Amino acid sequence: VGHLLTVRENDPRTEARGREHLSMGRVYDDISPALADWIRRQHVFFVATAPLAADGHVNVSPKGLDTLRVLDERTIAYLDLTGSGIETVAHVRENGRITLMWCAFEGPPRIVRVSGRGEQVALDDPRVVEVEFPEFRGARGVVLVHADRIADSCGYAVPKYRFEGERDRLLDWVADKTDDELIDYRTTKNAVSIDGLPGELTV
């Protein structure tokens, strides 16, 4: 659906709307410092992947905590924390396709998507070993995203929310587990995706 925009001369309201409208829906050559700063200020991001099978389940996972870093103009990394599933890792292992998305829930509306090729690497991989992630016990590895498309859109229909704080429940859950219990949990819960694709954890 197209947008019909009427801008009246010398009307600051319509001129402002025009500038805002024309600034959205862009495709970028890279992740600029300004865009990287905007990404860092978002409290949640979403990860979308899918298997190759036509009847396979598309997966979308919300992510929080201080787990994401912009490494350079075309590369993003985030910590893969222990969870109840292994969909993202199983999918990128099979076909590499991945999209990250952020929404502005505060401030001016905006949606940013970074699509490309993903891979899960070990925490001691030379490409990420010097990245300053917080120490999250139970991290399964790092997901690297090599961007081939970077774009934004308006986000005019996304509601506003106030950020109250991070949840502690996952960190508390991990703190109550021994190393052996975490290994047993991953062996049981993270071995395969819901479609039967192997997870193959790096740790």
Question: Over which residues does each language-model region extend?
Answer:
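Binding-site signature for planar aromatic cofactors or substrates
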Residues: G2-V203
